[in-house]
Amino acid sequence: VQTETRAASTLIAPYGGRLVDLMVPAAELAEAKAYASTLPSIQISSRATCDLEMLATGAFSPLDRFMGEADFRRVQNEMRLADGTLFPIPITLPVSAEDNLKLGSDVALRDSMNDLLAIMTVEELYAWDAGETGEKVFGARDPKHPIVAEMARWGGTNASGKLRVLQLPRHYDFVDIRRTPAETRAVLEQTGHANVVAFQTRNPMHRVHEELTKRAIAEKDGVLLLHPVVGMTKPGDVDHYTRVRVYKALAQSYYEPDRIVLSLLPLAMRMGGPREALWHAIIRRNHGANHLIVGRDHAGPGNDSHGQPFYGPYDAQEMVERFKDETGVGMVPFEELLYLPDEDRYEEVSKVPAGAKTANISGTQVREEYLGKGRLLPAWFSRPETAEILAESYPPRHKQGLCIWFTGLSGAGKSTTAAVLQELLLEAGRQVTELDGDVVRTHLSKGLGFSREDRDANIMRIGFVASEIVRHGGTVMCAAVSPYRATRDSVRAMMGEDQFVEVFVDTPLNVCEQRDVKGMYAKARRGEIKEFTGISDPYEPPLQPEITLNTERHTPEENARLIAAWLADRGFIRREVPVSSNGHIAA
């Protein structure tokens, strides 16, 4: 179903001319729900749930379903749907063999809480390759890219077909500003402005963002669509509850009422850089915007496993600019602004007078020098409301959650070092939970074997529990072989870069074999144990661990004190860490 927009609209038409509407009409809803209750059902992921909501309301117009093979292949290769329409990101529904889908049949789609969302007629089932998609769409096979690591765990088959949406995913927070594209357009219409400048954000807004957006709407003589993402963003981002409180405070106090519309977007970001920026432009057009502010490294995931950025700083701006005639959305560049303290104003870097005194605070400094140390951000950098909200929601680093992940071969010394470190952290005032790989297998992962699939499941279970501990401000130490790089990166992505410390216990195989307290290596050499890491199954060492330990040169206590000193240097523990009797702290 597609709905007409109002003929007299002053706003740009939706992408493709009309907004898709997949909602079952109210008159048919009871019958459709009764029918759905008789169908087999599958639970879809949080990402697919976000995508379904965006499809249902027309945010992905002209797309009206999870992509079939023809659309998927062409989008992957050419950034276009099968009919030639520009569309840069694949929107797919991965399924597994266990879902037991049959072509031509109907299936009910449910979310993670088992709430009934939609009926899908299975019209296509087709194979896809996560590595190929990572390379062609996101320019990477590196599991340090969060979507690449995530896709490796998706099913190898995609399903597609007609969707009849019975209800949108339930939201109980900020319901007054959760608006569909049609609802957003209606509010924008009331402002009387034909030009709409959209600002995509997944971070708190500071004075520089306020200044930038005000300049943009003045330049375009338009209204600002402040459109923060509240679906899935980059792991480790400030939670959306905190961010939205900031946005609401700024919108209410520092913008003219008819010059801003704050609306939340339930988008699951891919952190896909230039392709994602183009996708954002299409989504914002469907919400009524004809301009999009695009910053440096827009939707970038950070650095790869070799410490290099996945995308160039201006790739996203160039992509949106290149296709502006097709999307109908102009690119407004996010110019870098500096504060001039002597004049109490912001100015573009290129226009700062020679010799003028300037001030700036980087994102890293915000986290480490201010929030991480319990200091309020200065008024020239953030509005008082923003500074107070962030201070309330973002405790000093020594009170933040933390995961210390020990990885290495069996017998490397992970558990021994972790046991010493636990006492040092307790001494420093940290409350610590230890998740040891051997112990976990007798409880949380009881019944799992040692196939690659089972090993991944074991590590992901440990990671999930650890992420919940971290989310609630606790400290957790995990000691597990965790041989596969992609799986470790997936666990890192559950917590974010700042709260995950990967410790590589770099003990050579021959040393581990000499220790062999459990006799496991001897059994593996005799062929009595299959798929044993280091013997018949590979161990993939970390490429850029936060800490690397040498257990041949240093004792477990020395290595534990090295880790504790590293944590103290970065503010994770407050009290000074005593050095060992020989004065050793660092390798």
Give residue spans per PLM region:
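Active-site cores that bind ATP or allylic diphosphates and position pyrophosphate for catalysis
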Residues: Q2-H398
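Glycine-rich phosphate-binding loop of ATP-dependent small-molecule kinases
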Residues: G68, R74, R80, T191, ...
